[in-house]
Amino acid sequence: MNAVTTEKIIIPRSALFLGYSGLVPFVVLSLLLWWSPPHYAEQIQHALWLYAAIILSFMGAVHWGVAMAKPYDSGTGEPDKRMLLLSVIPALVAWFASFVSGLAQWSILYIAFTGLCVLDTESTKRGDLPAWYPMLRVPLTIIVVLSLINAQLAIAIA
């Protein structure tokens, strides 16, 4: 009789707590945009956009850490250049989006969060990130993207 075993993947509690706690500003600020007077809405928009840009940069930095922690490339004595490059792109995208006016800057952010999530999932498949990472990252990204779309709609309708 062949036994099939599957390893149960468990997300570390600290990562779970911090990850979901990090959603609070996204959700709260995006909802506040629907009910805020115009003079407060601009400050809320700025706070949400800035928080999203910072978190996007932070998420990209995961790959910098991976590049530093894993063995250096085949004898070159240098970290994985692909991982280093991937780590700085989200910060550059967020910075670029700060120069874009109107609703497009929100689209840039939620597209970047989505793209980075896909890349993170691929990095997990390659063994660069822990198996639990996408199980945390995908639901968080969905909530972030929905919050940013919600904010974009609230701004467009206001």
Which functions belong to the PLM regions below?
Residues M1-I11:
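Short, Lys/Arg-rich, polar N-terminal cytosolic tail immediately upstream
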Residues Y20-V27, L48-P71, E78-F96:
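Core segments of alpha-helical transmembrane spans in multipass integral membrane proteins
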Residues W34-Q45, I157-A158:
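Membrane-interface helix termini and inter-helical loops of multi-pass transporters
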Residues S98-G115:
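Transmembrane helix-loop-helix
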Residues I111-L129:
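Transmembrane alpha-helical segments of integral membrane proteins
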Residues N150-A158:
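Juxtamembrane boundary at the C-terminal end of a transmembrane helix
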